[in-house]
């Protein structure tokens, strides 16, 4: 059985046992998380959501928080002047192992939903603003 899930603005086709590198999620290594934004579930029959499949989920285990490959950007500032600079960036990623694809019954699984780091920062900011 496979599923197409959406996280970090990207879509991934996964099945049980797959290892994924996704945009950083607010969780620690060893945590079990669940993705509820499932666009499609396939197997014996295919179910396509509009936009999401109701009750479907993908459960995964966090292996590690890692950094991606370094991308180097060469910047030349002005013509006729020798001002040049290189800038680098390493994207923060979360390494996951997919443990289960659920076509239904995701609400009763008891596994915490996956949230991105922006969601965690926003929740912390809103909590501090209320105090």
Swiss-Prot record:
Transmembrane segments: none annotated. Residues 111-131 are annotated as: Disordered. Keywords: Ribonucleoprotein, Ribosomal protein, RNA-binding, rRNA-binding. One of its GO terms (molecular function) is structural constituent of ribosome. Pfam families: Ribosomal_L21p. It comes from the Bacteria. PANTHER family: 50S RIBOSOMAL PROTEIN L21, LARGE RIBOSOMAL SUBUNIT PROTEIN BL21M. Belongs to the bacterial ribosomal protein bL21 family. This protein binds to 23S rRNA in the presence of protein L20. This is Large ribosomal subunit protein bL21. The gene is rplU.
């Amino acid at each position: 059985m496979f599923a197409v899930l959406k996280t970090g603005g990207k879509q991934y086709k996964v099945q049980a046992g797959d290892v994924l590198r996704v945009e950083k999620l607010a969780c620690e290594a060893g945590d079990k998380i669940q993705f509820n934004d499932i666009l499609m579930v396939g197997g014996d029959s295919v179910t396509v959501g509009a936009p999401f499949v109701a009750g479907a989920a993908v459960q995964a285990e966090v292996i590690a928080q890692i950094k991606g490959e370094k991308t180097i950007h060469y910047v030349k500032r002005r013509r006729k002047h020798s001002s040049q600079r290189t800038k680098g960036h390493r994207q923060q990623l979360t390494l996951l192992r997919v443990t289960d694809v659920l076509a239904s019954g995701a609400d009763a699984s008891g596994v915490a939903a996956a949230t991105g780091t922006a969601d965690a920062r926003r929740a912390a900011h809103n909590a501090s603003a209320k105090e």
